[in-house]
Amino acid sequence: MALKPRTGNQYVISSGEWSAVVTELGASLRELKWRGEDLIVPFDPNKVIPCCNGWVLAPYPNRVTNGQYSFDGEDYQMPIDEFDRQSSLHGYAYRYMWELVDLQESHVTLSWRSPDIAGYPFDITITATYALDENGLT
């Protein structure tokens, strides 16, 4: 039995002259083509995903300085993962396998429930849908 790629299952969708591949790991957009031409830089499904390529940036999409923030009167400290800037960067959804919710010829939907992680104790579920039509990706 062959091993799964490092990035998990590969979900292929297409519509007309468009095609895309979305990975189970992080619900990342690995490939997007129009008329067979790459529109993004594709990455190898058996290698670590290059930084930020096709990532779903969740539960927060940017840097949190010193990994610290306050919410509803409470202070939180998230892990620092961008050491040169002392920031917590781009959330962590890209590090986890997402659950397949729906796969059709022209669209795929994946879902992920955030674990209780240091500094982000909120119970959230994120759903990502990639859909192709004659106009491209939505």
Language model features: what each stretch is:
Residues 1-137:
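Surface-exposed acidic/polar loop and edge beta-strand patches at domain peripheries
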